């Protein structure tokens, strides 16, 4: 790893290096507990300002809807600087569970030996994680201790989502798709496992002790089902705001427990939410509104069926 020689290296651990910069201490707001990086919807890097109480609230919410107990043994494959990876740790420590951590890659044999020997009971991944599992013939593996698979970090192709949902249904395991943002201390919604197949693609409902809603372009709350609007979230796990420069660390809570997610969604008759795309990610061609996110989803679905993929490549 390249190191700026202008700074003194204090220590190096697990690939991370702590440097002594000599910079003056930075004044911070008393409610600020920690910072996590995020790129947000625009891709511009910034830090999310968490306050004291965010993690505790999120831990309670997550452990409740997953039904976590001290007997759980989750296997952590996501980095701790990533909000969902961190949520795996704090939600399980909240109930006194053991978190299994390894630096082995999912493609290494040692990873699976560790998983079996340590009797891992759950696995949390992003769509890419499950694409790897699919290529590794995960469905043929004998993993009797594994009872829960959870997914977040983006929308999975429908066919892959269904494949894991059906596998879990047929093998006495639970498949729970979740939705969240760094700004909401990770998980903000989840799809109950009984809906994993019938409502595949939905993010489900708000986590316990929180609330989802939809608003129109005027900011009015949408009550009717199957009507698109911007999805909003209210809960104690909502963070304070962003930090783009040192001075921002002095800022107070700019959200007060409420945030507009920037996602365009609708709610069905059962109260389950479906995300259509990001606000603003639309083109207007010949008077018709075309969602870029929906186009990406269609292409992803096509690429998961060989015949359709051949047709797509031939276009």
State where each predicted segment sits.
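Structural core segment of the AMP-binding/adenylate-forming
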Residues: 1-28
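AMP-binding/adenylate-forming catalytic core of the ANL superfamily
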Residues: 123, 235, 240-241, 262-307
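Conserved AMP-binding/adenylation subdomain of ANL enzymes
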Residues: 56-73, 83-122, 207
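Conserved AMP-binding A3 loop
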Residues: 32-60, 311
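Conserved pre-ATP/AMP-binding loop-to-beta segment of ANL
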Residues: 20-37, 44, 67-73
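Positively charged, low-complexity/disordered segments
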Residues: 308-310, 314-315
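Conserved ATP/PPi-binding loop(s) of AMP-dependent carboxylate-activating enzymes
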Residues: 205-209, 220-252, 288-290
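Gly/Ser/Thr-rich phosphate-binding loop
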Residues: 120-125, 134-198, 211
């Amino acid at each position: 790893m390249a190191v700026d020689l202008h700074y003194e290296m204090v220590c190096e651990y697990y690939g991370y290096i702590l440097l002594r910069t000599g910079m003056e201490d930075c004044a911070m707001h008393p409610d600020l507990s920690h910072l996590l990086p995020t790129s947000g919807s625009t891709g511009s890097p910034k830090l999310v300002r968490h306050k004291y109480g965010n993690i505790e609230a999120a831990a309670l919410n997550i452990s409740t809807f997953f039904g976590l107990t001290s007997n759980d043994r989750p296997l952590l494959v996501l980095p701790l600087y990533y909000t969902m990876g961190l949520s795996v740790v704090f939600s399980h420590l909240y109930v006194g569970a053991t978190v299994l951590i390894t630096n082995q890659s999912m493609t290494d044999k040692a990873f699976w030996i560790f998983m079996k020997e340590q009797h891992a009971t759950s696995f949390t991944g992003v769509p890419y994680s499950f694409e790897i599992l699919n290529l590794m013939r995960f469905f043929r593996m004998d993993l009797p201790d594994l009872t829960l698979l959870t997914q977040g970090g983006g929308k999975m192709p429908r066919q892959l989502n269904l494949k894991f949902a059906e596998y879990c249904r047929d093998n006495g395991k639970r498949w729970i798709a979740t939705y969240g943002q760094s700004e909401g201390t990770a998980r903000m919604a989840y799809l109950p496992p009984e809906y994993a197949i019938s409502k595949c693609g939905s993010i489900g409902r708000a986590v316990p002790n929180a609330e989802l809603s939809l608003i129109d372009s005027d900011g009015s709350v949408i009550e009717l089902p199957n009507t698109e609007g911007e999805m909003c979230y209210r809960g104690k796990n909502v963070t304070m705001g962003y930090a783009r420069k040192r001075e921002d660390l002095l800022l107070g809570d700019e959200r007060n427990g409420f945030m507009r997610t920037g996602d365009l969604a609708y709610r069905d008759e059962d109260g389950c939410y479906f995300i259509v795309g990001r606000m603003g990610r639309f083109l207007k061609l010949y008077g018709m509104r075309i969602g870029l996110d929906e186009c990406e989803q269609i292409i992803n679905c096509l690429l998961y069926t060989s015949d359709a993929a051949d047709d797509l490549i031939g276009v």
